[in-house]
Swiss-Prot record:
Location in or out of the cell: Cell membrane
GO cellular component: a single term: plasma membrane
Keyword flag Nucleotidyltransferase: no
Name of the protein in its database record: Uncharacterized protein slr0104
Length: 811
């Protein structure tokens, strides 16, 4: 018996070695050759694990310090704003260009260029159309009001006739009663009293028949004028325009025709000369009065003046000719001479104790007297600033439980260094939005936003003079990309985000430029707007570049984006199709575990896409021997009963982890997805075969069974996502077996499993808190209830097929 036991132990040991050789640690690359095995040993060595963090930190600090502190490599000791330690004389005659002052002058010239204007034909046609509509409305009102004057002006003047037809019904009735019956006017208004005297004079010189005709004409005119007032009330026109139209009704026909033609001519003349935007009302009024001087009688003049002021108020037909303005500005810049600073031999450049000015610095630097050298203090300050930024970044990474690998450190270092480099070359072409979009897609929004703030600050420190419009524009666009990119699930959504990034970058640039250059706000739009559009297009271009380079970075640095995870979770992927075909029971088990884990991940705000994808691939290793797992036996004989050896059986079970890793590497699955294969089992005890072996050893009087041989080799879950999948995988079989149980029974079983995993220290490195376990348990039971919902039983008669017509029966 002891010999049999020794042989069994040897076989098991050999199988274990075979398994271990194909099951390296999850953070390493697959290896088959002896050289690769040596590399893996070095990679996993304690020395490398201890030395890597400080070495990588040092490389990152040196790289960023070298870029951010570039201006300290050759920095003048005698610069603008410093005191000269001694009096310095010009060694010879010299003249040097002041580049800084020259560039400032060029900016002033560009900003101060008076814009070229051009007449906009569309706006001109639109204003003429508005004029036609305005005059047509007056003509329609005059038509409704009828002929004016409606009585001979020798009898009543135009003003008196307009007053008579505009009387209200009550006032006219009082006046008519007085004229016809001699009834006195009660409390007559001044205008009624005036009309009373007028009719007294007419009655004295006019026959009753003529007076009756006059009254009839007045009533007709009042009726027609009432329609006019009703029309004006219906359209609810602007009160000022209404008054102008009523004023036009007071003119007789010939006078109105002359007034109308004058309005058209003056309006055309002003539009031909050009009407600029922003002209004030007093200035517009003076222009109109100048054109109308001594042309019309007083009342018609007032109608024309008011009409023109209303037609032209807040209107314009002159727009900026952007191309001509830009060319004019560039010509002015080219015509401008460089600002030069000159000095004669032995003349004093700066005296001892005097603060050096820009002009003096140009001379010192031109003569080579500015004492340029490496500013070690500046470099040390830069290194301290970079080190502090890295500490903050690492602290945030640990805070959100986002462990980073060596290749992650390298990628983040390269991305972070690229931005200050581009800022130094030209702030216009900085790639802050691109690195934010990539970091957010690979590592989440928190790290992306942290990186944007820190790298943006370092880039600002790297520049000798901060160009705020470029820095703030790119930073705002980068923050937008960092917040949103990790939530997008398709290339189309990322492309739309790129448009938003470009628009944000251009808009923030424009407003920052306006704030910084507020002194030239009247003409700044014409020079800043084209630059803002170009800068916005650059933001779009960086986003497109980030989207395009993302798949290559995913492969090169073994990182994933949400889009990549969605693609991997597609059931049409070759590996998932193989799993569904070769191990259908395992595939169904995987789907149920995915439902459990995904729901829990969503509840705990974990990476749902990663959990879904990792769960779908966590048991692919079972394809190496599908019948070795009960879910694939479909009610057939149990393979392990035929083997009847717990050591062989446990090696078959454990091998699904090592073989799964081999398959995952062969199909190019990312590391974060491969991590689910070993970590979902952790170092759990395969208790069924352990107890079987233990009982067999006790019956045979053999030495105690080594428990480690019946445990998975691990590692235990290293993230919240793999920890959730471990719990879901452990509970799946137990919940599936509960068909008629109530939720309380299911909850009790889930809690027992959770406590067993917690006490076995399987979750200690996962980041899951003990207080979160009841939340996960509640989610699991809720999903179980959804799967095992009750359905009504169909009556037997409903299942019987009744043939009504042979011709309609199909088999």
């Amino acid at each position: 018996m002891k010999a049999i036991f020794a042989l069994r132990q040897a076989v098991a040991s050999q199988l274990k070695k075979s398994t271990a050789s194909s099951h390296p640690l999850p953070r390493t690359t697959a290896s088959t050759s002896q050289d690769e095995t040596i590399w893996q040993k070095i990679h996993r060595s304690r020395f490398v694990r201890i030395a890597h963090p400080p070495v990588m930190l040092g490389i990152t600090v040196v790289s960023l310090t070298g870029v951010v502190g570039y201006r300290f490599y050759n920095q003048p000791q005698l610069s603008v704003g410093t005191e000269s330690p001694y009096t310095i004389y010009a060694p010879e005659d010299g003249s040097f260009v002041d580049e800084r002052t020259t560039e400032e002058k060029r900016k002033e010239v560009r900003a101060g260029t008076i814009p070229r204007l051009q007449r906009d034909n569309e706006l001109t046609a639109q204003l003429k159309q508005e004029r036609s509509q305005y005059l047509d409305a007056i003509n329609q009102l005059r038509y409704l009001a009828g002929t004016f004057p409606y009585i001979d002006t020798k009898i009543f003047t135009l003003e008196q006739q307009h007053l008579l037809r505009s009387l209200g019904p009550g006032e006219w009735q009082q006046l008519e009663d007085y004229i016809s019956y001699g009834q006195p006017l009660p409390m007559a208004s001044p205008q009624l009293a005036k009309l009373q005297q007028l009719f007294d004079q007419q009655k004295a010189t006019t026959s009753p028949e003529t007076m009756a005709g006059l009254l009839t004409s007045i009533r007709t005119a009042q009726d027609r004028y009432g329609r006019v007032t009703a029309r004006l009330a219906e359209v609810k026109a602007d009160r000022q325009i209404t008054n102008n139209q009523i004023g036009a009704l007071k003119l007789d026909g010939p006078t109105w025709q002359t007034t109308q033609q004058t309005i058209i001519q003056v309006h055309d003349r002003i539009l031909t000369q050009g009407l600029p935007a922003g002209i004030t009302a007093p200035l517009l009024g003076e222009t109109v009065q100048l054109h109308l001087r001594n042309i019309l009688p007083p009342q018609a003049h007032q109608v024309a003046e008011n009409s023109l002021n209303n037609l032209l108020k807040d209107k314009y037909n002159l727009t900026v000719d952007k191309e001509a303005t830009k060319n004019l500005a560039e010509k002015a810049v080219l015509a401008m001479e460089n600002v030069k600073v000159s000095a004669e031999k032995n003349s004093v450049i700066v005296r001892a104790g005097e603060v050096i000015t820009q002009e003096q610095f140009v001379l010192l630097d031109g003569y080579g007297l500015s004492q340029r050298q490496v500013n070690w203090q500046g470099l040390l300050r830069t290194a301290g600033l970079v080190g502090g930024a890295l500490i903050i970044f690492c602290g945030v990474s640990r805070r959100i439980h986002r462990p980073l690998r060596r290749r992650d450190h390298i990628l983040l270092c390269l991305l972070s260094v690229s931005t200050p480099v581009l800022f130094l070359l030209d702030p216009v072409y900085n790639n802050l939005p691109a690195i934010s979009l990539l970091t957010s897609s690979f590592y989440g929004p928190t790290l992306a936003i942290t990186q944007v703030v820190l790298v943006g600050g370092l880039s600002a420190f790297a520049m000798e003079s901060i160009v705020w419009e470029y820095l703030l524009g790119s930073a705002a666009a980068a923050l937008l990309a960092g917040m949103i990119a990790s939530k997008l699930r398709s290339r189309d959504e990322l492309a739309l985000l790129g448009v938003g990034v470009g628009a944000t970058q251009g808009i923030v640039y424009l407003f920052t430029y306006l704030i910084v250059n507020a002194s030239a706000v009247t003409i700044i739009w014409y020079t800043a707007l084209p630059s803002a559009i170009v800068y916005g297009l650059l933001g779009l271009a960086w986003s497109a570049m980030a989207i395009g380079v993302s798949p290559y970075l995913e492969r090169l640095f073994d990182v994933v984006t949400p889009t990549r995870l969605v693609e991997l979770s597609n059931p049409n992927c070759p590996l998932l199709q193989r799993l569904a075909k070769e191990a259908p029971g395992t595939f169904q088990h995987t789907l149920f575990v995915a439902c459990l884990a995904e729901s829990a991940a969503r509840e705990l705000r974990c990476n749902v896409e990663l959990v879904r994808t990792g769960t779908l691939y966590h048991d692919i290793g079972k394809m190496h021997d599908p019948l070795g797992f009960i879910e694939n036996q479909m009610g057939g004989p149990n393979k392990h009963d035929e083997i009847n050896d717990p050591y062989v059986s446990v090696d078959i079970i454990k091998k699904h982890v090592s073989e799964g890793l081999v398959m995952a590497r062969r199909y190019g699955l990312p590391q974060v997805v491969r991590d689910f294969i070993p970590e979902h089992q952790g170092q759990m005890l395969i208790s069924y075969f352990y107890i079987q072996a233990k009982e067999a050893a006790e019956r045979a009087g053999e030495p105690p069974v080594n428990e480690e041989e019946f445990r998975y080799t691990g590692p235990i879950p290293q993230s919240r996502e793999t920890g959730i999948v471990m719990l879901a995988d452990s509970c799946e079989a137990a919940l599936r077996s509960l068909r008629e149980a109530n939720p309380e029974t299911a909850m009790a079983m889930v809690n027992r499993i959770f406590k067993a995993r917690w006490r076995d220290n399987q979750l200690q490195d996962s980041g899951l808190k003990y207080e979160e376990l009841p939340i996960i348990a509640d989610v699991f039971v809720r999903v179980w209830q959804q799967f095992h919902h009750q359905r009504i039983a169909y009556p037997k008669a409903a299942l019987d097929v009744q043939v009504t017509s042979p011709s309609t029966t199909r088999f």
